[in-house]
Swiss-Prot record:
InterPro entries: GmhA/DiaA, Phosphoheptose_Isoase, SIS_dom, SIS_dom_sf, SIS_GmhA/DiaA_subfam. Residues 37-194 form the SIS domain. It catalyses: 2 D-sedoheptulose 7-phosphate = D-glycero-alpha-D-manno-heptose 7-phosphate + D-glycero-beta-D-manno-heptose 7-phosphate. Zn(2+) binds at residues 61, 65, 172, 180. GO terms for molecular function: carbohydrate derivative binding; D-sedoheptulose 7-phosphate isomerase activity; zinc ion binding. Binds 1 zinc ion per subunit. The keyword Zinc-finger does not apply. Pfam families: SIS_2. It comes from Haemophilus ducreyi (strain 35000HP / ATCC 700724). Homotetramer. This is Phosphoheptose isomerase.
Amino acid sequence: MYLEQIKGELQEAADVLAKFMADEKNIQLIQEAALLIANSFKQGGKVLSCGNGGSHCDAMHFAEELTGRYRENRPAYPAIAISDVSHLSCVSNDFGYEYVFSRYIEAVGQTGDVLFGLSTSGNSKNVLNAINIAKEKGMKVIALTGKDGGQMAGLADVEIRVPHFRYADRTQEIHIKVIHILMMLIEFEMAKTA
């Protein structure tokens, strides 16, 4: 009944991944992002992650694997997904949804911390505001984007961009793969100093 549609979806996902992998720059950027985060941890910093919708879930996933574990038992790493419902509803109501992440960064972000922002379009105003505040506070910024990078293009210290222009789910599929690879590399790097 739907076998061809299923095969088509899987093939498109494989094609998007193959295109992403074919650009050696993407491989280098993943390594650069992992080392940036590990170096922040080694210096007493933390990661603050944010995104909207599915990207919000990915931001939470990243933080929980840092504070919990990925593949191996090891010490917990300092990470916070900006996802506290009372904070989000308060700031949305009092200031506007475009400030839900930047207000949190303003409150707890410090020099040497890392902002990990996700936006499949690169145009999420609340993530853009978070990037601007993070930079003002001397934080490093890693952005996972899609399409042409949108307004986030060129703003982050490390931008990992999925060059896919159709549906956000394909971009999110690569983002979660990148997150898992980052986790693996961070654990490798942190184990060197354990």
